[in-house]
């Protein structure tokens, strides 16, 4: 069986976990590795944000509930959109709020994602990162479809490929074979749990390594990308980084999809030979998490920070001045939680009349841009 590694972390697993991993020298590498300033800076910033996070959550829990609902919708939409699974905004909102039933395969998968996302939000402390639980999450992800392989590891080989402009299919990466998959996932989970238990490496570095290896194994016939993002949330929450409940990490990934795939392509080179360097993917994920924390702190400020109550006009104006490019009324409302639609509309109208903003288009296609 081919060996599965989390880069720098391969070493003998404790006796309770039987694993094909045998490079014990790599234990020393992770403990003594000299990370560059970019990685260290990201980790330090996220640690600081985590410290402030507790204060925000204790001071204004009720006000943050609106952020939770917005993030759920954005996460469900974005993670599925990355995979080409879509529906209308109106249908999406109804599905997430459990006000309708799915009409087609895409909506079935969207509803499944919403359910697993809710499960992780509410029960992350009780979902161990183990093969059996991962299979259950996959089963629930595809619960509303008639796919027979839901909740099972892949039974046929899969490849990560792309279609060239000429129409030719180009293979980017060949994951492990089906017969190798169960043992590989078992080894991956055992290694993760053992390293975490021994506190050998910061979880912020360990989690991206796990996700990279998970994607290289590609354990399922379908749903690997969505499962990887759900597992990212699960592991972050379990380690105290709950920003994904309030700011959509999946949306941040979807908005930087090209960088996401580029980082994966760099990090999976020579993976089968255990000579890959996961640093590009680690840096990408740290940048995403850091960005989400910065967004979180800005939005927390909006929904109740400071001694003086900020008006909708002041908040929308602040958002508009910081925003690059055009934006819609919906985007302004999402960035300024705590204010009703009419307040956002009035603020946009006043800012347009004052010449701060320029209105582009009409009806549903209306956008605003800073003058």
Please identify what each model-predicted range represents.
Residues 2-371:
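FIC/Doc superfamily catalytic core
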């Amino acid at each position: 069986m081919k060996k599965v590694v989390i880069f720098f972390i391969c070493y003998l697993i404790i006796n309770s976990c039987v694993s094909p991993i045998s490079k014990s020298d790599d234990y020393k590498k992770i403990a003594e590795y000299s990370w560059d300033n970019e990685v260290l800076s990201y980790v330090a910033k996220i640690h600081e944000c985590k410290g402030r996070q507790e204060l925000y959550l204790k001071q204004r829990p009720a006000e943050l509930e609106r952020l939770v609902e917005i993030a759920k919708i954005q996460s469900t939409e974005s993670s599925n959109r990355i995979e080409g699974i879509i529906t209308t905004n109106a249908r999406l909102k109804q599905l997430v709020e459990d006000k309708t039933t799915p009409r087609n395969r895409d909506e079935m998968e969207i509803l499944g994602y919403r359910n697993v996302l809710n499960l992780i939000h509410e029960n992350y402390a009780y979902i161990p990162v183990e093969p059996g639980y991962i299979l259950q999450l996959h089963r629930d992800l595809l619960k509303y479809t008639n796919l027979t392989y839901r909740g099972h590891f892949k039974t046929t080989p899969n490849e990560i490929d792309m279609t060239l402009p000429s129409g030719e299919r180009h293979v980017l990466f060949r994951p492990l074979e089906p017969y190798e998959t169960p043992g590989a996932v078992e080894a991956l989970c055992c290694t993760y749990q053992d390293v975490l238990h021994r506190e050998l490496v910061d979880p912020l570095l360990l989690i991206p390594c796990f996700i990279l290896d998970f994607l290289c194994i590609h354990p399922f016939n379908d749903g690997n990308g969505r499962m990887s993002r759900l597992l990212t949330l699960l592991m972050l929450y379990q380690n105290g980084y709950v920003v994904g409940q309030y700011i959509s990490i999946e949306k941040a990934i979807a908005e930087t999809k090209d960088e996401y795939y580029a980082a994966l392509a760099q990090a999976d080179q020579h993976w089968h030979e255990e000579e890959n360097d996961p640093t590009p993917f680690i840096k990408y994920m740290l940048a995403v998490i850091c960005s989400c924390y910065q967004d979180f702190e800005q939005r927390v400020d909006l929904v109740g920070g400071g001694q003086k109550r900020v008006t909708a006009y002041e908040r929308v104006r602040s958002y508009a001045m910081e925003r690059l490019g055009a934006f819609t009324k919906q985007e302004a409302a999402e960035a300024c939680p705590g204010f009703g639609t009419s307040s956002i509309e009035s603020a946009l109208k006043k800012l347009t009349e004052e010449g701060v903003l320029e209105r582009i288009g009409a009806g549903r296609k209306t956008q605003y841009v800073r003058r």
